[in-house]
Amino acid sequence: MNTVKPESIALFCLTPGGVALAKRLAAMLPLTCFTSEKLREEGFIPFDGGFANTARQAFTTYTALIFIGATGIAVRVLAPLVNDKFSDPAVVVIDERGQHVISLLSGHAGGANALTRYLAGMLGADPVITTATDVNEMSALDTLAFQLNARMSDLRTAVKTVNQMLVSHQRVGLWWDAELTEEIGQCDIRGFIPVDDLQRLPELDALICVSLRNDLPELPVPHWKLVPQRVVAGIGCRRDTPFPLLATLLARQLEAQKLDPLALKAIGSVTLKKGEPGLIQLASCCRVPFKTFTAEALREFEHHFPGSGFVRKTVGVGSVSGPAAWLLSQGQLLGETLREQGVTITLGVAH
C-alpha cells in the first residue's frame, strides 16, 4: 500500500517542459512550486538567490522535495546536506516528460518510495525504486514506522537488523494491539508474518510488536516494540511550574494508563501558556509539538469537566487540561485527570 503524507512538498523545475509537468502535478497534489524568474507563471515562486540556494533551504524546511529534471542536478545540489535516512526529507526526481519517477533519498523512513509510487500512478509513469526490500516485493520496518507514525527506542539498529532478515527470507512476525487492527490493515506488511496471539507464537526468527503499552510479556524470540504516536496530553499549570515536576507527573499519568512514553503525540494547553518555559521544555524533551488553544475554543468543551473559579479568572476558562485534551483527541479521552501541585493532566487518543 502507498501511504503518502503530503504535509509540505516543494517542487523544483528548470525548463518549460518542467513547468508544464509541475502544473499537472499541482492540480492533483498540494505543492509549493519553485522555478526561475524567467519561467515563472501564476502559482510559482521564483528562486531566492538561485536554484541551488533555494533547494538547499527547502531541504531543511519541507518534508519532501520533487525535482523535475536530471537526477545528477539534484544529487550535486543536495550532496552537501545529506545526513541521515531517518531525518532527511524524501527526495524524488521526475524527467520532464513524466516517463520515470525516481525515489532518490529517504525511500522508507522519509516516504520517498510511497511518494514515488503515488506520483507515478498520477502520471502513468514508471516508478524507479531500488531499495532491497521493495525490489524483493517486501515491506520494511522503517516503512511500517513511517506509515504508522511510530517510534522505537533504537529504531536505527532495529531497521538494519530486521530489514536484512526480511530480504534474507527469515521469518519475522508482526503482532499488534487489537485497537490498531484497522490502521495495520492500511499498511504495507508484505514479508512479515501476522501473529494473532503472543502466547502461541509460530516458528519465528524475530518479532515486531506494534503497541501503545508500556510493557510486553516475556517472549522467546528476539523482538522489538514499535510504538505509534497516538496519545495526547492536555496540561494546565501555574506560572513557572518547573519542568522536572511536569515531566514527573506526565510520566506518572502515562504509567497509570499503562502507556509507553513513546506513544505521546502532542501536548496542549491554553494560549496564555504559549511561552511557559516548563511546558516548552517538556514538549521538546518528549519530541512532540506543543499546541495551544484560545480560551474561547476551550470554553466550548469545559462543561464536560470540573471547573475552577481561580483558573477562570486567570486564563479565561474554568478548565484547561480536559478541554485541551478533548480538542487534541476529538473527545477520545483516557482515564481520569491527574490533579497535583497546581498541575492538571488529561490524556486522550488521537488517530
UniProtKB/Swiss-Prot annotation:
Its EC number is 3.7.1.12. GO terms for molecular function: cobalt-precorrin-5A acetaldehyde-lyase activity. SUPFAM superfamilies: CbiG N-terminal domain-like, CobE/GbiG C-terminal domain-like. It catalyses: Co-precorrin-5A + H2O = Co-precorrin-5B + acetaldehyde + H(+). It is an enzyme of class 3 (hydrolase). GO terms for biological process: cobalamin biosynthetic process. InterPro entries: CbiG_hydrolase, CbiG_mid, CbiG_N, CobE/GbiG_C, CobE/GbiG_C_sf, GbiG_N_sf. Keywords: Cobalamin biosynthesis, Hydrolase. Pathway: Cofactor biosynthesis; adenosylcobalamin biosynthesis; cob(II)yrinate a,c-diamide from sirohydrochlorin (anaerobic route): step 5/10. Gene3D superfamilies: 3.40.50.11220, CobE/GbiG C-terminal domain. Belongs to the CbiG family. This is Cobalt-precorrin-5A hydrolase. It comes from Salmonella typhimurium (strain LT2 / SGSC1412 / ATCC 700720). The gene is cbiG.
